[in-house]
Amino acid sequence: MNVKVYNLDGSEKGDIELPAVFETEYRPDLIKRAVISSLTAKLQPKGCDAFAGYRTSAKSIGKGHGKARVRRTAQGAGAFVPQAVGGRRAHPPKVEKILFERINKKEKLKALASAIAASAIPEIVSARGHKIEGVPSLPLVVNAEFEGLVKTKEVLDVFKALNLAADVEKAKDGIKIKAGRAKLRGRKYKKPRSVLVVVGDACEAIAASRNLAGVDVITANDLSAIHIAPGTMAGRLTLWTENAIEKINGRF
C-alpha cells in the first residue's frame, strides 16, 4: 500500500510504500496487555522493616486479669499489636509481591504491530478523541527534512500546514490541575496526549517538538505500544518521517 509523502509546507512530494505492519489485524486485547506490562515494569518493590513495631520490651501478663491480653509496657500502655500506638502494621507491603505483568516477546511485538496499524485507521483515531479534520491522510508521512528542524516555531508551522495544530490546541486546553496529593508530588497537571512524532534517529527535531502541548517524540527503534497507544487506547494521531518508515520496515 502506498501513501502520500508531504513537504514541510503541506504540499505533496510523492509516494512511499508502507511496510506490511500497517496491515496487521487490530487486537485491542494484546495492545492493552503490552501497555500494562510497560507501565508495571516501572513499579519498584516496597516493603517495611522486618522488625518495625517489634522493638519493645512490652510483655503480656496473660489471662485472668479482666483486661485484654495484649502486650503492655511497664506503664500499662498497649504495644506491639496493630491497634496500639507504635505497634506493627497489620498487613504491611511485601517485597515478594509480583508487580510486573509479564508478556511474551512475540505477543509484545504483535501488540506493537497492531497499534501501528490502528494509527492508520481514521475511525479508531477519531474515536480516541483526536482532531483529524483536514489531516491530508492517515498514516501521515512527512519529508525527512522535518528531522532537521531546530525551532519549536518551525515544527508548529509544519503542524499548521498539515492541519495537526488543532489537536495540539485541544491538548493545551485540556491541561488541568489534579485533585489530591499528586499536586505535592511532582505531578501537578493532567496533560492530554496529542500528536506522536516518530523520527528515524536521534535528531534536533526531538527537542524542537517536545515543548508543544501533548506532543511526544520517539525514534522508530524505541517505539513501543505505550507510546502509540497510551492508556491502552490505540489510535494515536501519529506523524511519521520517511526515515522512520524505513526503520519500522526493518523492525518487522
From Swiss-Prot:
Alphabetical list of PANTHER family matching this protein: 60S RIBOSOMAL PROTEIN L4
GO biological process assignments: translation
Function: One of the primary rRNA binding proteins, this protein initially binds near the 5'-end of the 23S rRNA. It is important during the early stages of 50S assembly. It makes multiple contacts with different domains of the 23S rRNA in the assembled 50S subunit and ribosome. Forms part of the polypeptide exit tunnel.
Organism: Methanococcus maripaludis (strain C5 / ATCC BAA-1333)
Protein name per its UniProtKB record: Large ribosomal subunit protein uL4
GO MF, one example: structural constituent of ribosome
GO CC terms in record: ribonucleoprotein complex; ribosome
InterPro entries: Ribosomal_uL4, Ribosomal_uL4_dom_sf, Ribosomal_uL4_euk/arc_CS, Ribosomal_uL4_euk/arch, Ribosomall_uL4-arc
Pfam families assigned to the protein according to its UniProt record, in alphabetical order: Ribosomal_L4
Homology family: Belongs to the universal ribosomal protein uL4 family.
Subunit structure: Part of the 50S ribosomal subunit.
UniProt KW keywords: Ribonucleoprotein, Ribosomal protein, RNA-binding, rRNA-binding
Record flagged with keyword Ribosomal protein: yes
